Regions:
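Tandem repeat scaffolds
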Residues: 5-18, 24, 28-186
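Long, contiguous interaction/recruitment modules in multidomain scaffold/adaptor proteins
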Residues: 1-2
Length: 186
């Protein structure tokens, strides 16, 4: 069974396609546009690749198993969103809000998490190669079993972060922090 198309997904009596068209109009500052509020929307197992969700409200949305490759999610509110096994490769999530989101087993390589709120996010088993976490809040995040190869954690506070079972040998860590010191803490 393939992924669902945006036009077949309904939220608040409208198709997701209509909502995203109005959001794109809003984002470009044109008359008649409306910011997308997809709070609690079920967009699981959907093809949403390359879509513009910049500044959208996606609180508690279910995006599990969805294809979001190359989507624009900068400054989006994904608080508590379900992104389990979602494909987020090469998305821009700069300055997005994701506290309590579930990104377990997500394919999230190449993401910009620059200045994001990732507090208490579940990254267990996620693919996070070449990810930028600079200046992100990752307090309380769980990375157990995640792949953080060549990830950037510079200028990131690692207080309360669970990095157990994570190979940090190629991860760029904050100044003065070593992989050995972090593994002793786990």
């Amino acid at each position: 069974m393939g992924l669902r198309k945006a036009k077949s997904i309904k939220h608040g009596g409208k198709s997701l396609e209509e909502i995203l068209q109005a959001h794109d109009t809003f984002f470009r500052g044109k008359e008649g546009g409306v910011r997308a509020d997809l709070t609690g929307a079920d967009m699981s197992n959907a093809d949403l690749s390359g879509r513009n969700f910049n500044g959208a409200i996606l609180r508690e949305a279910n995006l599990s198993g969805s294809d979001l490759r190359k989507s624009k999610l900068a400054v989006a509110d994904l608080s508590g969103a379900k992104l389990h096994k979602a494909d987020l490769r090469n998305c821009d999530l700069t300055e997005s809000i994701l506290p309590g989101a579930d990104l377990s087993e997500a394919q999230a390589s190449g993401i910009e998490f620059f200045r994001c709120d990732l507090s208490n996010v579940n990254f267990q088993g996620a693919q996070l190669r070449n990810v930028n976490f600079r200046l992100a809040n990752i307090s309380g995040a769980k990375f157990t079993g995640a792949d953080l190869g060549v990830a950037i954690l510079r200028e990131t506070d690692l207080t309360g972060v669970d990095l157990s079972g994570v190979d940090l040998s190629t991860t760029l860590l904050p100044k003065g922090v070593t992989a050995a010191a972090l593994s002793k803490r786990a």
